[in-house]
């Protein structure tokens, strides 16, 4: 089993072989690093059983706690600037995508990301004989963020 958080191929890049194991792909709809359509394309090409999680308004870093580091000091980019280092534009974008005003606060998505990741792995690895907490309706109970789960059991 595998989980891919914000995944995609670069234009012109050869597509990797399709895994023959259950998979889950998660993407933020406001990801400026890997377009959500690229993650959707990976999901579309996967073998079932497969799961796709879309997090509305979330950027690239929604799947990490990087946005929480030095939040009150301008985040990671602010901290780097504070110590006098220059960060190339490409790295500035990467270090802030998902942490900016107008994007979903990543901490609001953590409960859904954590729950769906664990539920998927428990089922896929045989710990749970039937899916538990992998129904699309469950996302409404996890967070006030809009999280959409698409399931293709095969």
Label each region the model flagged.
Residues 48, 66-154:
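Alpha/beta-hydrolase-fold serine-hydrolase catalytic core, especially in secreted/extracellular enzymes
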Residues 1-63:
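The feature captures the conserved acid-bearing segment of alpha/beta-hydrolase catalytic domains
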